[in-house]
């Protein structure tokens, strides 16, 4: 019934047949064979139902070649399965296009397209595209490479009262340039040179119309109070330029640059010089001009309405309710604000102090201002917070060093070895109480609480932190445990010395103190005996 099954190998056919027999009652059959873009069934069938295991053979379409087994098989799931078995054939490389380029859009495989284009100034003769198509048993390009030929322009036009650089024998191709010149006493109006360009990618045209040659004469303008910075003759021709300024105290109204036009007139209109504005920067006390104003420092005239901003110098501040600006008024005078005033520093609290150079005839908004200084002394029992009792008012409105003031006598931080203070700082004020806490293994010898007295000393006397000998360490005869009793493992040297001494003591004890009496005095014996017991 299915002669196409003969194309399947015998072992594969046996496996497919067995699976079909076993699974056919359980699973569904396959529908019509699949429609593949690259191949068609060898035998066309209009059946719509195929048993599991059916294998159909396909042939590759034109433009494709077989790379694998070309069978599709109905599997146990009722689906047609296959591996891609046809691949697109490849067209040859199209080569290089002189004065143009070949653009490969995707690849060189069957069905792909390449595009041709010419370089600027060249016209394309032939097809702009070519496709990789089937030609018999192989594939090749549908269209050959086109030709790119250079674009040509007609001869440039002649002009009256002038000529161009070309000759009758010249061939004008893309990029060719010709230049026009006028006869003596004539001015060239327009572009002196024109070039051969391409229109619509195929037609050669000149870049613009040729210029003309005309007689143009402009006379030097009369500008009262004006100064000519360039151009000092009496007559000028087309495109000649004048640069104009005004004398000090006058301002230019109009353009400072004018050109002689083709109609023998100046353009823009001839300017004028008028006395309009404030002269020079005004004098304002204690200010510094902003950077953009400093750039105008050499400017002689400022127009009416000119607004100049300033900052206050170091140590000065803007006068309250006054703008930090000066304005040029219609009467050609500067409207000047009150400027800046010195920065104030706060008046010191006179409690427990007196100022040696106290000011009594001050004027202004504050008692002490920038650059003022104070010498002061403190009452008995107090001292200045600045070492020399001197303080100066700074630009930021702060006293340096610190605002003049007096503090009560202080005590320095007590030095407690192997201990710490309840309050840690460098200085302590009068009547301030401090508690001493010894490190672990140490005990306070002396009062634990001390107070800063008015004479800058601590009372009672500053205590010490000494090693507290544990009960089990008081008997040193068994010196082996002595290291465990030490407060600090770094004291190994001391421990070894003590251990050595304990061994000697033990030996002396065994010898019934015979040799001890020879080596030690009665007082030393008493100390050793006490240490052993």
Curated annotation (Swiss-Prot):
Q: Which UniProt keywords apply?
A: Cytoplasmic vesicle, Disulfide bond, Fertilization, Glycoprotein, Repeat, Signal, Sushi
Q: Fetch the CDD domains from UniProt.
A: CCP
Domain Sushi residue range list? 29-88, 89-150, 151-215, 216-275, 276-342, 343-408, 409-467
Give GO BP annotations, semicolon-separated.
acrosome reaction; organelle organization
Record-linked InterPro entries = C4bp_oligo, Compl-Cell_Adhes-Reg, Sushi/SCR/CCP_sf, Sushi_SCR_CCP_dom
What tissue specificity is annotated for this entry? Testis. Not expressed in heart, brain, liver or kidney.
Tell me where in or outside the cell this protein is found.
Answer: Cytoplasmic vesicle, Secretory vesicle, Acrosome lumen
PTM entry text: The N-terminus may be blocked.
Sugar-bearing residue positions: 68, 77, 185, 191, 200, 433, 455
Q: Which Gene3D superfamilies match?
A: 1.20.5.3730, 2.20.28.230, Complement Module, domain 1 (2.10.70.10)
Please give one Gene Ontology molecular function term for this protein: structural molecule activity
Function as written in the Swiss-Prot or TrEMBL entry: Probably involved in the formation of the dense core and M1 domain of the acrosome. May also regulate the release of certain secretory proteins following the acrosomal reaction.
What is said about its interaction partners and assembly? Homooligomer; disulfide-linked. May contain 6-8 monomers per oligomer.
Protein name listed in UniProt: Zona pellucida sperm-binding protein 3 receptor
